Regions:
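Conserved residues at the C-terminal ends of beta-strands
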Residues: 28, 82, 167
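Short, contiguous strand/loop micro-motifs
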Residues: 25-26, 52-53, 75-76, 182-184
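Phosphate-binding site of ATP-dependent enzymes
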Residues: 113-184
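Short hydrophobic/aromatic-rich motifs at helix boundaries and adjacent loops
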Residues: 36-39, 59-61, 94, 166-171
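Surface-exposed, flexible loop/turn segments at secondary-structure boundaries
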Residues: 33, 57, 87, 162, ...
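Short, solvent-exposed loop/turn segments at secondary-structure junctions
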Residues: 31-32, 106, 146, 169
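Active-site nucleotide/adenylate-binding loops and adjacent lid/helix of ATP-dependent enzymes
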Residues: 18, 43-46, 51, 56-140, ...
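ATP-binding N-terminal substructure of ATP-dependent carboxylate-amine bond-forming enzymes
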Residues: 1-55, 64
């Protein structure tokens, strides 16, 4: 059955037997933060969840994910982190253009953009300084990879790839299906 996290509530005395969630919950909240904290509540009650809190917390944060991929010798674009607007601008200048800036937390390609020159870098950094999100004060920059207009999404269970698809750009920089890319 379907559980709507938006209308479900818990407290510190909540017990598994008070809910009819079945044997395991497949967490698929659209909101990362809602899903993460909903998972924490379910795990608090010893309800098995896919994906577990630790997995969702790690994979939902691009900075942590990038560091773990690197630590495990998985090739990724060169990635830079900085924690102030000034240092981010210095990184742009020292590393050179083009780079891609991404929010450390986010999905659907939102706020992911190529930065090809100093004027664009300054505008992007200035825009992030007026937002209220604390994660916007962490600057995640990646080298821009010259690649075909597609990426590959792979679904794994344990160490086994069980499904994969190309996501082909519909003419832009991003290959996200929510933004119009075509699955194949």
């Amino acid at each position: 059955s379907m559980i709507d996290a938006k209308i479900t509530s818990f407290d510190t005395d909540s017990k598994q037997e008070n809910y009819d969630f079945g044997d395991v919950v497949l967490e698929r909240c659209v909101s990362y933060y809602r899903g993460l904290h909903f998972t924490a509540c379910l795990e608090f009650m010893d309800i098995p969840v896919i994906n577990k809190f630790d997995v969702a917390n790690t994979c939902g944060n691009k900075m942590i994910t990038s560091m773990l991929l690197k630590k495990n010798n998985i090739p990724t674009p060169k990635t830079y982190f900085s924690f102030s607007a000034e240092t981010a601008l210095e990184n742009f200048e020292n590393i050179g253009y083009p780079l891609v800036i991404k929010p450390i937390i986010g999905s659907w390609g939102r706020s992911v953009m190529p930065v090809k020159d100093k004027d664009t870098a300054e505008a992007v950094i200035e825009n992030r300084q007026v937002t209220d999100g604390p994660q916007d004060r962490i600057y995640y920059l990646q080298e821009m990879i010259d690649r075909p207009p597609r990426d590959i999404r792979v679904i794994t269970v344990g160490d086994q790839a069980v499904s994969a698809m190309y996501r082909k750009s519909s003419g832009g920089f991003k290959t996200n299906i929510a933004l119009g890319a075509d699955p194949e």
